[in-house]
Amino acid sequence: MAFSHIEGLYFYNTASQKKELFFPNHTPVRLYTCGPTVYDYAHIGNFRTYVFEDILKRTLVFFGYSVTHVMNITDVEDKTIAGASKKNIPLQEYTQPYTEAFFEDLDTLNIARADFYPHATHYIPQMIQAITKLLEQGIAYIGQDASVYFSLNRFPNYGKLSHLDLSSLRCCSRISADEYDKENPSDFVLWKAYNPERDGVIYWESPFGKGRPGWHLECSIMAMELLGDSLDIHAGGVDNIFPHHENEIAQSEALSGKPFARYWLHSEHLLIDGKKMSKSLGNFLTLRDLLHQEFTGQEVRYMLLQSHYRTQLNFTEEALLACRHALRRLKDFVSRLEGVDLPGESPLPRTLDSSSQFIEAFSRALANDLNVSTGFASLFDFVHEINTLIDQGHFSKADSLYILDTLKKVDTVLGVLPLTTSVCIPETVMQLVAEREEARKTKNWAMADTLRDEILAAGFLVEDSKSGPKVKPL
């Protein structure tokens, strides 16, 4: 899709700390996003990141780019091993239900599928090969605990993504944990030596002994195997900047000698009661929790899009209810468009102008670092303008179809608009509608009101128009 008045896409690059014009090195665009660690159900804070990444990919496609998208599935790391060992079951048996639940949640939130979902356990040989190369280069070493570590002192550019100055920090002890804070940059683990008490029966054989790969190495190898040595975009949550993405850069560039990714995009935290939503804090909600409260995936997706991805978003039930109301307004608008039946061969000039101006405003918002909240503002301005045109009585079926097509275009990015309002109306309700219409024709207003109340009690609203009654669910 071409936009004559838009210079190009601008993204905020974490590495440079500024907005940059997007100019990919590859066709299709190589996009890698960090996926779930399948030790539990993903919470809606995780899904804020996944929805942001979905908007990123949809925006690229909207602007005419083809994209190859890889999202990893982390099925072996500290937490999955601990979970499987605690239940005394094989690793795959432990992770498989959470993997399946993740894909179900993606569908519920209308998140477009990636092209590849590599599982870490499927790439162990490639990871062993990479560690062997790093050992041969002298960039990695075997510690006293028999684990293999990456030496930060052998990679001078370490810290360039998270903007760390190693000379001013305590460095470089060794750390075998997958996650740690940026005040303590350490030689990180590439291969974690097997510990029977900790790991049970979960290990792989390697030239450097039994064990399993470190979490950071897993993403590097899966990305490079499927997308090549250099990516166009690497995205994730702000939690991933350090140490995960910093370590990915170090080991990947040490292996290839090439820049690992050109653009780094990171989404901010989802808050609950003003605090970061986190499993470690115990203040998290899963998508399933919200579905059990009778919210919909559409409402949750809408809520997760209500602030710019680089701004923290505070979750409240009131905010989710407000999203339900906004979606109802949009649904009523679509229903009104579908109900237009005035004949017309072509859309009005004002309809064409309004649609063109809306698409331009929406596209400018996206091009400005995925400013979806501004895009929504332009959408509701557009809805108000078209409702005014309909009120004037000159809006034809051709106009309504053109507007519906415009909404479909923007929804290829948003993925949240209620673009169909058709529902199955029970025959009993339609019979009541017919009886009410007959009562109105005979001016039996008391009977018409009684039948209207029965229709309402059945969960439907009847609206009278020049072309006859229209029925829609409450």
UniProtKB/Swiss-Prot annotation:
GO terms for biological process: cysteinyl-tRNA aminoacylation. The keyword Protein biosynthesis applies. One of its GO terms (cellular component) is cytosol. ATP binds at residue 279. This is Cysteine--tRNA ligase. Disulfide bonds: none annotated. It is found in: Cytoplasm. InterPro entries: Cys-tRNA-ligase, Cys-tRNA-synt_Ia_DALR, Cys-tRNA/MSH_ligase, CysS_C, Rossmann-like_a/b/a_fold, tRNA-synt_1_cat_dom, tRNAsynth_Ia_anticodon-bd. Its EC number is 6.1.1.16. It catalyses: tRNA(Cys) + L-cysteine + ATP = L-cysteinyl-tRNA(Cys) + AMP + diphosphate. NCBIfam families: cysS (TIGR00435). Its cofactor is Zn(2+). A motif ('HIGH' region) lies at residues 36-46. It comes from Chlamydia pneumoniae. Binds 1 zinc ion per subunit. The keyword Lyase does not apply. It comes from the Bacteria. Belongs to the class-I aminoacyl-tRNA synthetase family. The gene is cysS. It is an enzyme of class 6 (ligase). One of its GO terms (molecular function) is ATP binding.
